[in-house]
Amino acid sequence: MSFDVDVTVRRGERAIVCRFASAGGITALVGPSGAGKSSVLEALAGLLRPEAGRIAVGGTVLFDSLARVNLPPEARACGVMFQDLRLFPHRRVLGNLLYGQRLAPPERRFLSLEEVADFLDIAPLLGRRPRTLSGGEAQRVAIGRALLSGPRFLLMDEPLTALDDARREAIIAVIERIRDELALPILLVSHDRADVARLADTVVELRP
């Protein structure tokens, strides 16, 4: 499934121009802080309306300023993992996962809760609160919630930030398994070029 992006996104007085096409696998947006990486990811998710341009994923047009197409986030079938994870602190891990599952209509569900818990090795965490999780555990729960939403593709904003080496390796392995075993195309944002060199099939450079 391909990403086909040609958009201008505005943040305040600054226009961020991003153009790329990738054939699937893992696509990485790289660049220094302030380059607009997260803004482009939000545009794909439908959380930020581009000023102009077109976004298509797997041949489905998500946004087209000329054709006046702008699908709402819930119609884009994308799983989003935010940099701050955004787990609900008042819900246990199970509740966070079930929230993701409820976002997916039955016809889009390709993994059960049990399958996701096994795939990510988070079954022992289901009864815990997010505040009791390590960084790596919280990352896996956030990935699980995204997978349970029945996505056609995943958007991941700095999924390896603030992890020690062991937890970083564990999350890298999860991302690789999602690509290889679930065949989900992934767009990830990263500032770490070593991680990008290891993971990405396509690299898109953004400059401030």
Walk through the language-model features, giving the residues of each.
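ABC ATPase NBD coupling module
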Residues: 62-79, 103
